[in-house]
Each structure stands twice: as structure tokens, then as C-alpha cells.
Amino acid sequence: MTKDQREKPKKLTGIAVSPGIVIGKARLVDRSRVKILYQYLIDEKQIKWEVERFEEAVRAAKKQIIAIREKMPKQIQEHSFILDTHLMIMDDSMFHDATVETILKERINAEWALKKSLQKINKLFAEIEDEYVKERVVDVEYVAERVLRCLAGKEQESLFEIKERVIIVAHELSPADTSSIDIGKIMGFITDVGGRTSHAAIIAQSLRIPAVVGLESVTWEVQDGTLLIVDGYTGEVIINPDDNLIIHYQEKHLAQKELESSILRMSHLPAKTVDGYKIAVMANIEFLEEVAAAKDHGAEGIGLYRTEYHYLRGNELPGEEELFSDYKEMVELMAPYPVTIRTLDLGGDRLSPGAGTKTETNPALGLRAIRFCLKNPDIFKTQLRAILRASAYGNIQVMFPMISGLQEFLDTHAILKQVMGELEEKGIAFDRGIKIGIMIEIPSAVSVADILAKHADFFSIGTNDLIQYALAIDRINEHVAFMYQPFHPAILRMIQHVVKVGKEAGITVSLCGEMAGDPLCTSLLLGMGIDELSLNAWGIPAIKQVIRSISMEESKADLERILELDTAKKVREFIEQRMSQLIPYLGRKDLNAEEGSLRGRAQR
């Protein structure tokens, strides 16, 4: 094929979940779902055999997952809990027992019964608003798919079998798939579906291979051997790039690597502005295995430790000793830095069957987080005892989510005081001066922040939920997600108000959520007077570098101008223009994905 006959370049844009740039050939991996062709009734004599057929498929699926876990690359063995979760799902009553019961009661084949169980589970997850928790339904779907393949006698191609350097292209990748990645063979991956909090994204970040998800139709656009460029910084994928584009992205790759190396080398330096203002930059984590990455990237503590995992992974609620052991190890690993533990932020609809709760029609606005804990004090006290006991081993702070007003906080604080009293009576050590904070993520809490500040030791502004609730936007709803605007003037005024009243009360105000990890927001938040930022570990070096490149004086001056602007668009344009002046590499043309021969030809 001559140069003139070559297909024209085409650009798709998805969600960048792991940074880096790779240029290579596509390897299309079939991950299409098994179609249930036969749904049939069985007679009484066949019931026992059909149940055994299902049980045998589950056993076979378990063996496959165990084999994958044993072959996992050492770089991602810390994420083996993902596969452990899949093994537990197969034993979960809603998955396993419900399917067996359906076979027995309705006298239908195992495939049909499993499909019915999956539909019920999907319905439960569909009612959940929390993005991270909602995406966990894919784990159940992956497990069901594996069992269905075992029932049908169909095997998938394993990524272990790939022998050449390629870019994986798939509709979606399961945790078992990404756990099979050999970084000596697989340069990166791109998928039609997926999100920032998917297991595939987490694994890609751990392996440091570029990945873009949510491309919608890439499997229709690409064939085996198609030349691709994957930009894990911007979420762009170039199909059939021309020579100019290849050269451009090669140069961008080298420039980014040079920049990242420089920033990473300085990640353990303090986040101090050029005029001497110091701000703490901490990590958001969910698993103990993430502590090493947090420390390696210069985290000065854990600003948000999500504790929901223990409540999601099994059939029973976690016990006090299990929680205590986890929290104690966490604080010891992070010493001498602080660890802020957020208490349970789920509704009963997502807890283990041991919670004995019922499904709600709108859980996001229902009995969740602190509301659920106040309604279920025994569950709450178990977690509080574990947190308090762990506080004897290091610097722990406790934070309550979804507080809407003072009475809720006072009721919560009363339970904490009660647990403290019980521990004192038993002579169990804990930090009697433990700091108690409030997650500011509901508009009503913003309105009464001045009142709350008189009773709390610190605030943490949870921007993800605050933006959703304040703008009435479901950011994972594709029809309105574009309206999710961190730079909306209303959001900026809310944040500024919380910081102002926090300062007046003499308490620390931190901020977590996607805004904390966005370099475009850093100067703005500094100007407001935020004391701490908490974000994903891999983003810490870049944020610290931005802080070291600007002055508080300039940030405050820019803030005054920003607060006069009346639309999110104007705010973003102003910030982008100012950041390109203050921090040249944020606006460098050689790092700008819009440059090159594809300008004007972007396709979605």
C-alpha cells in the first residue's frame, strides 16, 4: 500500500485512566458475552443433575480464577484481592444460593436461573448513585460470564497467551484479564466501556501502562494489526496515524517522560509556594496495598481513607477485630503522618446480608452514610471502637460523611463519646484527643458551615458529591454529565464560604475529590486558603510541583477576578490562560494534544 492509499487518520476520545503514550499494533480481543440460546423447563428428575451442572461450572470457574491469581505479575500482586472478591461472589447467597433456589423452585435450566439472579443484582445496583459502588456490579457480571462460559464449554483467549508487543483492544476487560497482563508483551489497552474507578484502570496505573476506556466504538473501528497511538494523558486514540502524527506523539512522549521524571524526583519536597505558603498534599486510598504508592509519590498523610471495602466483600458484616487490624496497620505504615478515616459511607442496600436492610427506591437521597449509621448504632459502634483502638498506635482522625446539619453531628458525636466511655471503663487505650471532622458535601452543610465549625475539629470538602447535589447532576448519566461543572460560580462560592468560616473558627479545611487532583484548580484553591488537598497518589507529584511554581499573592489576586466571572466557561478560560503564563509546561504546544495534523478532524 502506497502512502497515498493509506487510510486517513481518525481520532476517538475516551476517558484517560492511566498516563503514557504508546504507538503500536492493535490486538483485538474478543470479550463478547455468551448468548443464552436455550431457556427451558426441566422435569423433576433433572433438577438434581441441573443443580450439579451449575455447581460444577462454579467449581471450574473458581479453578480458572485461582490459576490466574497464581500467575499474576509481581507488579500487581497487591491487587489479588480483586480476584479474591470474585471467588467470594461465587459463594454469595444472592449469586449462588439464589440461582440454586431458582432451579429448584422454577424448574429451569442453570443458564436461565443464573441470568435471573444477575438481573435481580443488576436492579439493585442500578438504584445506586455512588459512582465507585455502582461500577462494582461489573464484578458480578464478570463472574456470571465466567460461569456461563463454563456451563457452555466455551473458553476465552487468555492474555497470557499473547506473544508479541501489542495494544489490546476490547469491548471491556475483566479484572481477570488485566491480572493476566504481561508488560513485556502488552504496551497498553483501550476499551469501548469502563470508567476511572474500574479495576482495569487501577491495574493499568499500577503497571504504568497507558490505558483509555469509554471509547464506545473502538472495537468497530479497529482490526488486528491496525496501527494505533494511545494517549493516556488526554484520552485520545489515533487510528492509522500518518507520519507527521507519529513524529508529533513521539516528541510528546519524550517531553512528558522528561517532565514526569523531573517532577517525580522532587515529589518528596514540601508543597510550598514561592512566597513561602505551605499546604499539605495527601492521598485518597481504599486499600492497605495503596499505602506504598502514596508514600512513593510524596503523600504527607492519608486525607481520605474509604472504609467501605470491608462491608462489600463478604456475606457477613466485618467484626471489630478485622477492622481494628486493618486500621492499626494503616496508621503504622503511614507514621508519623496522619490518617483520616471516613466512617461507613454506604446505604443498607449495598451492605452484606447480615445488615438485614431493605432496598430503597432512591438510595442516594435515602438512608445512607451517617444516616444509616445513626439508624444502626450497633454497626456504627463496631467501626468506631476499631477506629478508636487503632488511634493508640498513631495519628488518626475520624471523619463523618453526609452530615446535613448540627443535630446530626451532635447525635453522631454523642455515640462516639459513648464508645469512648465504654473503652475507658475497660481500660482499653485510645487517643482521647482524637480529632473529629465533618465531610462537607451537602448544600445544607455549606449553609450552616459557620455553626458546624464551632463543634468540629476540621472540615473536608467532598467536591464530587457537593457538585452533584448542588447542581442536581448525576455525573454518570450521559445525558446530563456535561453539566457537571467544578468551575460553576455557585460551586466556587460554596467552597470559598466553607474555607472562610473554617478559618474564622480556627479549624483546618481540606478538600478531596477530582478538583484536588486537577492542576487547573490548584491555584484557585490556594487563593481560597485551603489547608490540605487529598487526591489519588499518582497525581500528587504534579500538584506539589504546581504549588511550588506559584505564589499565594498571585493566587489571591486571580481569585478576586475569578469570583467576578459569571459562567463556568469564562472561569475555565481565564484559569487556562493564567496557568499557561504562570506554569509554562501546562500550556506547552509540544504537549498539547490538539496540535499536529489531526487539528480540526477530531471525531467522537
Predicted regions and their residues:
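Non-catalytic, soluble scaffold/interaction modules
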Residues: 1-333, 339-346, 356, 376, ...
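Conserved alpha/beta-domain cores
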Residues: 260-594, 604
